[in-house]
Protein backbone atom coordinates (compact mmCIF):
# COMPACT_ATOMS: atom_id res chain seq x y z
CA UNK A 1 0.00 0.00 0.00
CA UNK A 2 2.76 2.48 0.87
CA UNK A 3 4.42 2.02 -2.53
CA UNK A 4 1.11 2.30 -4.38
CA UNK A 5 0.06 5.49 -2.56
CA UNK A 6 3.48 7.09 -3.09
CA UNK A 7 3.65 5.96 -6.72
CA UNK A 8 0.16 7.17 -7.61
CA UNK A 9 0.49 10.63 -6.08
CA UNK A 10 4.26 10.96 -6.55
CA UNK A 11 4.71 13.35 -3.64
CA UNK A 12 8.27 14.17 -2.60
CA UNK A 13 8.92 11.63 0.15
CA UNK A 14 12.27 13.21 1.06
CA UNK A 15 10.95 16.73 1.62
CA UNK A 16 7.44 15.82 2.82
CA UNK A 17 7.38 12.29 4.27
CA UNK A 18 4.06 13.03 5.98
CA UNK A 19 2.37 13.38 2.57
CA UNK A 20 3.29 9.80 1.74
CA UNK A 21 4.13 7.71 4.79
CA UNK A 22 1.87 9.45 7.27
CA UNK A 23 -1.29 9.78 5.20
CA UNK A 24 -1.10 6.18 4.06
CA UNK A 25 -0.39 5.06 7.64
CA UNK A 26 -3.72 6.60 8.65
CA UNK A 27 -5.55 4.40 6.16
CA UNK A 28 -3.46 1.40 7.12
CA UNK A 29 -4.43 1.87 10.77
CA UNK A 30 -8.11 2.05 9.84
CA UNK A 31 -7.77 -1.20 7.91
CA UNK A 32 -5.81 -2.93 10.67
CA UNK A 33 -8.41 -1.93 13.28
CA UNK A 34 -11.10 -3.60 11.15
CA UNK A 35 -8.87 -6.63 10.53
CA UNK A 36 -8.25 -7.09 14.28
CA UNK A 37 -11.99 -7.08 14.93
CA UNK A 38 -12.66 -9.66 12.23
CA UNK A 39 -9.54 -11.79 12.89
CA UNK A 40 -8.39 -11.98 16.52
CA UNK A 41 -5.44 -14.13 15.36
CA UNK A 42 -4.05 -11.35 13.15
CA UNK A 43 -0.42 -10.31 13.49
CA UNK A 44 -1.27 -7.03 15.24
CA UNK A 45 -3.52 -8.88 17.71
CA UNK A 46 -0.69 -11.31 18.45
CA UNK A 47 1.68 -8.36 19.04
CA UNK A 48 -0.83 -6.80 21.46
CA UNK A 49 -1.07 -10.12 23.31
CA UNK A 50 2.73 -10.39 23.58
CA UNK A 51 3.02 -6.83 24.89
CA UNK A 52 0.32 -7.57 27.45
CA UNK A 53 2.34 -10.56 28.72
CA UNK A 54 5.51 -8.46 28.99
CA UNK A 55 3.97 -5.32 30.51
CA UNK A 56 1.25 -6.97 32.54
CA UNK A 57 -1.43 -4.78 31.01
CA UNK A 58 -3.30 -4.56 27.76
CA UNK A 59 -1.89 -2.15 25.17
CA UNK A 60 -4.12 -1.38 22.24
CA UNK A 61 -2.72 0.41 19.18
CA UNK A 62 -3.60 3.86 20.56
CA UNK A 63 -1.83 3.09 23.83
CA UNK A 64 1.23 1.85 21.96
CA UNK A 65 1.31 5.01 19.83
CA UNK A 66 0.99 7.15 22.95
CA UNK A 67 3.90 5.30 24.53
CA UNK A 68 6.07 5.90 21.46
CA UNK A 69 5.05 9.59 21.37
CA UNK A 70 6.05 9.87 25.03
CA UNK A 71 9.47 8.42 24.18
CA UNK A 72 9.85 10.86 21.25
CA UNK A 73 8.83 13.79 23.46
CA UNK A 74 11.06 12.75 26.34
CA UNK A 75 13.69 15.42 26.95
CA UNK A 76 12.06 17.55 24.21
CA UNK A 77 13.11 15.32 21.29
CA UNK A 78 9.78 15.70 19.47
CA UNK A 79 9.88 17.23 15.99
CA UNK A 80 7.15 18.81 13.83
CA UNK A 81 5.36 16.61 11.29
CA UNK A 82 6.34 19.01 8.51
CA UNK A 83 10.06 18.13 8.72
CA UNK A 84 12.30 16.88 5.90
CA UNK A 85 13.27 13.21 6.07
CA UNK A 86 16.97 13.98 6.54
CA UNK A 87 16.24 16.26 9.51
CA UNK A 88 14.41 13.62 11.56
CA UNK A 89 16.29 11.54 14.08
CA UNK A 90 16.13 7.88 13.09
CA UNK A 91 13.64 7.12 15.88
CA UNK A 92 11.49 10.16 15.12
CA UNK A 93 11.27 9.36 11.42
CA UNK A 94 9.19 6.28 12.22
CA UNK A 95 7.24 7.76 15.09
CA UNK A 96 6.48 11.16 13.57
CA UNK A 97 6.45 10.69 9.79
CA UNK A 98 4.25 7.60 10.12
CA UNK A 99 2.44 7.55 13.46
CA UNK A 100 2.11 11.18 14.52
CA UNK A 101 0.93 12.12 11.02
CA UNK A 102 -1.60 9.28 11.07
CA UNK A 103 -2.90 10.57 14.40
CA UNK A 104 -3.10 14.12 12.99
CA UNK A 105 -5.00 12.84 9.93
CA UNK A 106 -7.42 11.10 12.27
CA UNK A 107 -7.93 14.43 14.06
CA UNK A 108 -8.63 16.15 10.72
CA UNK A 109 -11.04 13.38 9.68
CA UNK A 110 -12.88 13.65 13.01
CA UNK A 111 -13.15 17.42 12.54
CA UNK A 112 -14.42 17.20 8.95
CA UNK A 113 -16.54 14.10 9.47
CA UNK A 114 -15.85 10.83 7.68
CA UNK A 115 -18.00 11.56 4.63
CA UNK A 116 -16.54 15.01 3.90
CA UNK A 117 -12.98 13.95 4.73
CA UNK A 118 -13.25 10.97 2.38
CA UNK A 119 -14.60 13.25 -0.34
CA UNK A 120 -11.66 15.63 0.24
CA UNK A 121 -9.15 12.80 -0.10
CA UNK A 122 -10.82 11.41 -3.23
CA UNK A 123 -10.80 14.85 -4.86
CA UNK A 124 -7.16 15.42 -3.85
CA UNK A 125 -6.18 12.06 -5.30
CA UNK A 126 -8.09 12.61 -8.56
CA UNK A 127 -6.73 16.13 -8.98
CA UNK A 128 -3.09 15.34 -8.14
CA UNK A 129 -2.36 11.72 -9.11
CA UNK A 130 0.91 11.46 -11.07
CA UNK A 131 1.57 15.21 -10.64
CA UNK A 132 3.97 15.53 -7.67
CA UNK A 133 1.78 17.51 -5.22
CA UNK A 134 3.27 19.85 -2.60
CA UNK A 135 1.80 20.64 0.85
CA UNK A 136 -0.01 23.71 -0.54
CA UNK A 137 -1.70 21.46 -3.12
CA UNK A 138 -3.26 19.07 -0.61
CA UNK A 139 -4.35 22.03 1.53
CA UNK A 140 -5.89 23.79 -1.46
CA UNK A 141 -7.69 20.64 -2.56
CA UNK A 142 -9.09 19.94 0.92
CA UNK A 143 -10.15 23.57 1.37
CA UNK A 144 -11.80 23.71 -2.05
CA UNK A 145 -13.73 20.49 -1.40
CA UNK A 146 -14.71 21.31 2.19
CA UNK A 147 -15.23 25.08 1.71
CA UNK A 148 -13.28 25.55 4.96
CA UNK A 149 -10.10 27.36 5.96
CA UNK A 150 -7.76 24.59 7.14
CA UNK A 151 -4.69 26.70 7.94
CA UNK A 152 -4.99 25.54 11.56
CA UNK A 153 -4.15 22.02 10.37
CA UNK A 154 -1.84 22.39 7.39
CA UNK A 155 0.13 25.45 8.51
CA UNK A 156 -0.08 25.31 12.29
CA UNK A 157 -0.58 21.77 13.58
CA UNK A 158 1.79 20.14 11.07
CA UNK A 159 4.52 22.74 11.59
CA UNK A 160 4.88 22.71 15.37
CA UNK A 161 5.86 20.28 18.05
CA UNK A 162 4.21 22.37 20.76
CA UNK A 163 1.76 20.13 22.62
CA UNK A 164 -1.87 21.14 22.72
CA UNK A 165 -2.87 22.07 26.25
CA UNK A 166 -6.55 22.55 26.98
CA UNK A 167 -8.15 23.64 30.23
CA UNK A 168 -11.70 22.46 30.93
CA UNK A 169 -13.63 24.04 33.76
CA UNK A 170 -17.20 23.49 34.84
CA UNK A 171 -19.34 25.57 37.14
CA UNK A 172 -22.06 23.94 39.14
CA UNK A 173 -24.00 27.17 39.66
CA UNK A 174 -24.81 28.00 36.04
CA UNK A 175 -24.01 24.53 34.67
CA UNK A 176 -21.52 25.94 32.16
CA UNK A 177 -18.49 24.16 30.77
CA UNK A 178 -15.62 26.30 29.57
CA UNK A 179 -12.99 24.90 27.20
CA UNK A 180 -9.91 27.06 26.76
CA UNK A 181 -6.71 26.54 24.77
CA UNK A 182 -3.77 27.33 27.03
CA UNK A 183 -0.90 26.40 24.72
CA UNK A 184 -0.08 24.83 21.39
CA UNK A 185 -1.47 24.93 17.87
CA UNK A 186 -4.64 26.88 17.18
CA UNK A 187 -6.80 23.84 16.54
CA UNK A 188 -10.59 23.98 16.68
CA UNK A 189 -12.08 23.06 20.04
CA UNK A 190 -15.38 21.73 18.70
Where are these regions (language model features)?
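Hydrophobic alpha-helical and helix-loop surface patches within well-folded domains
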Residues: 1-188
